[in-house]
Amino acid sequence: MEFWLSWVLLVAILKDVQCEVQLVESGGGLVQPGGSLRLSCSASGFTFSSYAMHWVRQAPGKGLEYVSAISSNGGSTYYADSVKGRFTISRDNSKNTLYLQMSSLRAEDTAVYYCVK
């Protein structure tokens, strides 16, 4: 019985830890090839301005693909070759928000996009 209670307590603690950090993406939608979209990621539960942030994506039936990254102060960025020149990552530390401006969209950009701490 003690083991069971310990296990339940551990699960409860881990659940609380997981709930502390929240990253909520928005801005997706349907767009024609060549169109544009801006994704947003609202962050809470941690000091956003202290962390580099990243975008990754997963196309239907495919694995995760790294898309872009930005340093904590926004001064340094990285782009995968597949999106370079078309996507722009940015952040607003005063709003705890990460952005991904996507232009000249292609069929192969179809994916679920995730922001990552």
Swiss-Prot record:
Ranges for region Framework-2: 53-69
UniProt-annotated stretches for the region Complementarity-determining-2: 70-77
Chain positions covered by the region annotation Framework-1: 20-44
Ig-like domain span: 20-117
An annotated Gene Ontology molecular function: antigen binding
Keyword annotations from UniProtKB, A to Z: Adaptive immunity, Cell membrane, Disulfide bond, Immunity, Immunoglobulin, Immunoglobulin domain, Membrane, Secreted, Signal
Region named Complementarity-determining-1: 45-52
A single Gene Ontology CC term: extracellular region
Ranges where the record places region Complementarity-determining-3: 116-117
Region (Framework-3) location: 78-115
Covalent S-S links between cysteines: C41-C115
Gene Ontology biological process terms from the UniProt entry: immunoglobulin mediated immune response
Matches recorded under InterPro entries: Ig-like_dom (IPR007110), Ig-like_dom_sf (IPR036179), Ig-like_fold (IPR013783), Ig_V-set (IPR013106), IgHV (IPR050199)
Superkingdom of this protein's organism: Eukaryota
Signal peptide residue numbers: 1-19
Transmembrane segments: none
Subcellular location field: Secreted; Cell membrane
Protein function: V region of the variable domain of immunoglobulin heavy chains that participates in the antigen recognition. Immunoglobulins, also known as antibodies, are membrane-bound or secreted glycoproteins produced by B lymphocytes. In the recognition phase of humoral immunity, the membrane-bound immunoglobulins serve as receptors which, upon binding of a specific antigen, trigger the clonal expansion and differentiation of B lymphocytes into immunoglobulins-secreting plasma cells.
Subunit structure: Immunoglobulins are composed of two identical heavy chains and two identical light chains; disulfide-linked.
PANTHER family associated with the record: IMMUNOGLOBULIN HEAVY CHAIN
Protein name: Immunoglobulin heavy variable 3-64D
Species per Swiss-Prot/TrEMBL record: Homo sapiens
Gene: IGHV3-64D
